[in-house]
């Protein structure tokens, strides 16, 4: 019995998911303009982990025919995983986060990437719901990274994009990357004193935010100031502060609020004073991009 038979996976097309994936890639020139095919997975996994297990099963099923994904990622709506070839790309995504359903489609690679690049370049107001994805990870970098949206024009926009990304990671990472972490640093460089804030989402643990406070005063007043802003834990050896949040929508919102508050307290006047650095996932291999965050990348050294 094959893995797919054992999982009893079917699709609305009447084909098994591996057969459907192979069919879409084989007949891509005639299928590339067709609407996505809704997938059905039976039996439905237990409710608490149904979304994660359903996604893993679907990824494994498509991989039987097309090999492992070339691009992992997710939008504000749900996961978007891709099997990219030079001519066409098969896409596994979710049309509705509330429903948790999955669908499979194929699109011409060049047209898809040009269209998405245009959407990122011309994004206004950083409405993350209108963007094709918020994060994308290539285990083996083969595709050109997408352009980033313009820098957030104010703190409200940046907070919204941070919250959307962190919420997506809290919901999507485990189903795609297992127990691997994803992280990035935000650097504030004012008065020639770069200050670094680290954001980490771990499927095995929590949503963690750390800030370098080595130039902070060693006093009760400063300690009270930091805890008043929302920091929970001082690490004396390294002189960093940490705050830890549940991997939920509420946790993502609280973390985004703390990040914005701390960046302003560290001297940033606008999001243009920030730089994005050390973006990575897992053991650091591959390429993780965050095109919808609204923070300029770090300048080359």
Regions found by a protein language model. Name each.
Residues 235-250:
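Well-ordered alpha/beta subsegment
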Residues 51-54, 248-255:
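Short, low-complexity cationic-aromatic patches
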Residues 1-195, 200-208, 212-214, 218-223, ...:
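Short helix/turn-capping signatures at newly exposed starts of structured segments
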């Amino acid at each position: 019995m094959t893995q797919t038979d054992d999982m009893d996976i079917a699709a609305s097309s009447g084909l098994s998911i591996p057969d459907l994936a192979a069919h879409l890639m084989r007949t891509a020139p005639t299928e590339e303009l067709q609407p996505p095919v809704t997938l059905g997975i039976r039996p439905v996994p237990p409710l608490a982990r149904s979304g994660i297990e359903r996604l893993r099963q679907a990824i494994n099923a498509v991989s039987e025919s097309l090999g492992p994904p070339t691009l992992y990622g997710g939008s504000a709506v749900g996961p978007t995983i891709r099997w990219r070839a030079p001519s066409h790309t098969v896409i596994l995504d979710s049309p509705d986060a509330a429903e948790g359903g999955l669908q499979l489609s194929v699109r011409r690679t060049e047209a898809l990437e040009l269209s998405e690049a245009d959407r990122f370049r011309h994004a206004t107001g950083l409405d993350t719901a209108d963007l094709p994805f918020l994060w994308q990870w290539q285990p083996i970098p083969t595709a050109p990274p997408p352009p980033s949206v313009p820098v957030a024009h104010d703190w409200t926009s940046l907070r919204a994009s941070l919250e959307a990304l962190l919420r997506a990671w809290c919901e999507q990472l485990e189903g795609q990357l297992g127990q691997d972490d994803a992280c990035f640093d935000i650097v504030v460089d004012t008065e020639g004193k770069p200050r670094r804030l680290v954001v980490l989402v771990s499927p095995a643990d929590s949503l963690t935010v750390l800030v370098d406070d080595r130039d902070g005063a060693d006093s009760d007043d400063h300690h009270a100031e930091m805890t008043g802003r929302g920091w929970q834990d001082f690490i004396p050896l390294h002189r960093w502060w940490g705050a830890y949040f549940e991997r939920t929508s509420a946790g993502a919102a609280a973390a985004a609020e703390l990040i914005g508050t701390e960046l302003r307290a560290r001297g940033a006047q606008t999001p243009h004073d920030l730089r994005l650095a050390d973006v990575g996932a897992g053991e650091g291999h591959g390429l993780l991009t965050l095109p919808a965050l609204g923070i300029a990348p770090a300048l080359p050294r």
